[in-house]
């Protein structure tokens, strides 16, 4: 009975997400990623800034209503994102309806079309269900294993709540960019493959991998260095010890951001190559190891809750490495480690050094946390340009995809 408010609060999100996915797919098919990217940012920001106040007010009633407040915030964020997509779709639909039809094209019959859709969608759907299914298993596994590790149940509930409610919520914000990058790769690579344009396919794949590290590395290191400051800015902690443990969890968990970003990009590339089963299998293997490690590590008294981020790091590493191998195999491209990895890593290291020095020199406080975040963004952007991690040639395709969509041209 205590979970009923949560189920009622999250139930509308099921319908909202399905409708929004169809609209996102329409826009992505036109290689216009702006609506998808903005709607995802609306989702993630809404989950943080709407869910938290609702959880606060719900806590005045009971813990169950606090959890329901978080879930209701998710439904509200999905609803606002869907409303945005509907507005954009209505604006764009007239332009696409006005395009002349190709008289040589024969529309597919319902059965072949349905068969083709299912062959593409079933592996993608199963792949998308893997991580939520593992999270569902973890929700019961983590708490029980913390108790098995000798932690009092009340303390275990606090640890689990801070990890799942605080740490994972913050980690999900930058991963929205990873999903946007992945989704932008699918239509462009599929189009190049359909034309037999191997050069463009390899260039887009290389760009996607480069952007994964350009975006993922600074997010991982920046959040890791500023974990305590970011948590203090957004959340309230009853004791310094609670803040310390949560900051350590966030610092370790933030390293999964870059791994998740690369997994998403390589999955997008493979899906564009019509190899959508491969990322499903690699992620399934990673999640299986994650569940096993969670059970083993969290039950150890000396590791306990810290086993959860360690298991996540292992999960995405296991998924990432074979994905990279298959991308190289099926695209035929050579992995330019200097351009794809080393230059972004150098820019990130320089940013990290500046941030570490600034943390020592600047006073603590919410205002100074915002200053540190701004400093990290600005210094990384400067170092990325100076080291060549990001160039004008890299930005041009990104701006074309994210900056303006275009209707498909009629082929003669």
Report the location of each language-model feature.
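Membrane-interface junctions at transmembrane-helix termini in multi-pass inner-membrane proteins
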Residues: 16-39, 255-285
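Interfacial segments at transmembrane-helix termini and the short loops linking adjacent helices
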Residues: 1-10, 224-257
């Amino acid at each position: 009975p205590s979970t009923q408010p949560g189920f009622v609060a999250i139930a509308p999100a099921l319908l909202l997400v399905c409708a929004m996915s169809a609209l996102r797919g329409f826009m992505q098919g036109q290689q216009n990623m702006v609506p998808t990217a903005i709607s995802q940012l609306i989702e993630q920001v809404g989950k943080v800034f709407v869910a938290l106040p609702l959880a606060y007010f719900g806590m005045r009633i009971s813990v169950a209503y606090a959890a329901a407040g978080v879930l209701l915030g998710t439904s509200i964020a999905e609803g606002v994102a869907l409303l945005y997509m509907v507005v954009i779709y209505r604006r764009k639909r007239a332009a696409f309806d006005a395009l002349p039809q190709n008289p040589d094209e024969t529309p597919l019959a319902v059965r072949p079309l349905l068969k083709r859709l299912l062959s593409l969608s079933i592996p993608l759907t199963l792949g998308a269900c893997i991580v939520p299914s593992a999270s569902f298993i973890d929700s019961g596994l983590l708490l029980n294993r913390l108790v098995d590790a000798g932690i009092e149940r009340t303390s275990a509930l606090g640890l689990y709540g801070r990890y799942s409610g605080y740490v994972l919520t913050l980690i999900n914000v930058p991963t929205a960019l990873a999903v946007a990058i992945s989704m932008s790769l699918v239509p462009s690579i599929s189009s190049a493959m359909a034309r037999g344009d191997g050069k463009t396919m390899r260039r887009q794949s290389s760009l996607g991998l480069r952007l994964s590290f350009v975006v993922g590395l600074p997010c991982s290191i920046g959040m890791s260095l500023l974990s305590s400051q970011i948590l203090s800015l957004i959340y309230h902690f009853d004791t310094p010890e609670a803040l310390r443990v949560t900051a350590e969890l966030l610092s370790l968990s933030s390293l999964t951001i870059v791994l998740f970003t690369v997994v998403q990009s390589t999955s997008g590339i493979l899906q564009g190559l019509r190899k959508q089963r491969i990322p499903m299998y690699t992620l399934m293997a990673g999640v299986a190891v994650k569940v096993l490690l969670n059970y083993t590590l969290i039950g150890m008294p000396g590791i306990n809750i810290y086993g959860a981020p360690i298991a996540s790091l292992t999960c995405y590493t296991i998924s990432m490495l074979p994905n990279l191998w298959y991308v190289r195999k099926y695209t035929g491209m050579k992995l330019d480690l200097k351009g794809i990895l080393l230059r972004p890593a150098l820019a990130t290291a320089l940013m990290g050094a500046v941030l570490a020095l600034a943390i020592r020199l600047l006073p603590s406080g919410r205002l100074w946390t915002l200053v540190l975040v701004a400093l990290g963004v600005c210094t990384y952007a400067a170092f990325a340009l100076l080291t060549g991690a990001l160039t004008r040639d890299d930005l041009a395709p990104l701006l074309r995809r994210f900056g303006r969509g275009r209707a498909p041209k009629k082929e003669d």
